[in-house]
């Protein structure tokens, strides 16, 4: 999920249009988990929207480091990722210990230690070994993002150092496509096997990163008065893909789905990034976007805990409980940690700023 500073701490840097996009993405995930027959592709679309936005934002943070300091501040980068991602993850793992360790509602008590280990090492997307409780298999998306956070700063650093960042981005995209095609070919008889593999959807993060690096060109191409029509096209495409029945079972989903959702997300993003304050009427979706990370963490296990616990199958109950858990996570864990991080940052000196052009990062 995308790591963004909480609004209560850094409201001057938060763009409500991006929270609106996050809210729409997590809503798609909620719809897919509760009404899979109607929203067959919504989970894929929602997750890949997050991936694309993550690639866009993280590349922006790294490029900003180059512009201001002439280098990537790795310590600060990974510290911020830790403060943003780990507390909410630990909170949902407490839920795992209670529901599956103490109460054993899913008959998975024996898997709890392994699940915690896999979750904290971000290896849920690595195939060919036991990941623990199936109720936490959705953490493959976090694994994808964390692995991206490990590799991408190094690519940006090398690209900036040798003024070949665009070339490296293109090479990375080609390598990912080759790996994806090979994976599809190898698993074509059981294509759903590759759904949560590391290379299946990572191309969308590179699409987001490329969009950030090409921002001036895209501003000229789909900015200004063209932004709204372009966003409408992107939104229609995302909606259509979200309604594809049994999307996980189609070979074409894996071959072009990541790129198609990534490009469509960029079209929508180019309009929404202008909305520092979102229009009236979408406030609830913006608020949902703020807590989207925690809602995602809790939604999938809650859906299974209800079923395994014998609760009546009322899909809307899962949605309501997931949002409630997200609110609790935000109020009890994420917001206090964000405030602590903000206090620590005010005490620390960033060092002398270096007015260096970011053009090197875009070469």
Language model regions located:
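Alpha-helical transmembrane segments in multi-pass integral membrane proteins
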Residues: 2-17, 24-46, 58-76, 98-102, ...
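Hydrophobic residues within the alpha-helical transmembrane core of Major Facilitator Superfamily
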Residues: 30, 94, 120, 151, ...
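Structured binding elements
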Residues: 50
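Alpha-helical transmembrane segments of multi-pass membrane proteins
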Residues: 75, 79-92, 156
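Hydrophobic alpha-helical membrane-insertion segments
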Residues: 84-106, 110
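Hydrophobic alpha-helical membrane-interfacial segments at the cytosolic entry of transmembrane helices
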Residues: 88, 92, 168-177, 229-237, ...
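Extracytosolic (periplasmic/ER-lumenal) interhelical loops and adjacent juxtamembrane/interface segments
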Residues: 112-132
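Function-critical hydrophobic alpha-helical transmembrane segments in multi-pass membrane proteins
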Residues: 132-157
